[in-house]
Amino acid sequence: MKRITALALSLIMILCAACVLAEDAGKNEIGTLKVGEAFSIQSRMPEGYTYMPVTETELNMVGILSAGAGKPAVTVSIAYNEEYADTERFNDVDEAVVEEIRDSFREADEEVTFEDLETAYGTRLLKVSGDGFVDIYTIYKGYELEFVMTGDSFTDADVQMMVDFISDMDFVTVE
C-alpha cells in the first residue's frame, strides 16, 4: 500500500512539473535586467510579431516587436527607475503619482487621452492615446514598462493584443 501511495504521489509530482514546463513552452526570452537581483524577461510573442532588441544594459532595454503588413509596429521599453524601487506594481502608487505620470505624458502632447486598463492578473495599466500612437504604461518591481504602438489607426483588438502580451510577461529571477 505504501508503494502504491508513493508511486501515485511521484506520478502527480511529475505531471505537475510537466504542466509548469508546458505553460512556459513557447515563451521567448526578451532580455535580462539586473538591479540587485537579475530578471530574465520572457513572454509569448503576439501572432505575426517577432522581437528585435535595439539596446540592452543592466538597467534598461529597448526593442521592437516587428509585424507584418497591416499591423501596428510596437516599441518595447523597460527601464529601472529608482523612484519606484520599492514599488511592486503600478497598483501600489498613489493617485498623486499617477497624476504626475499623466502630466509627463501631457508635456509631450497636450491632446493625449487616458484610460485605465488592467492585465489578466489585475495589474494596473495606463493607456495613453495620441495622434498616431497608443502607449501602454505600467510599473513592475521598480521598472517602468512602456509598449508604444505606432501606425495610422488602432483597433480594440490591437490594444487587447498588447494587454495580453503584458499579461503573459514573466520576470524570472536569474541565479
What are these regions (language model features)?
Residues 1-8:
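Positively charged n-region of N-terminal signal peptides that target proteins for export
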Residues 15-29:
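Sec-dependent signal peptide cleavage junction
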Residues 44-48, 69-71, 120-122, 138-146:
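Short, solvent-exposed coil/turn segments at beta-strand boundaries
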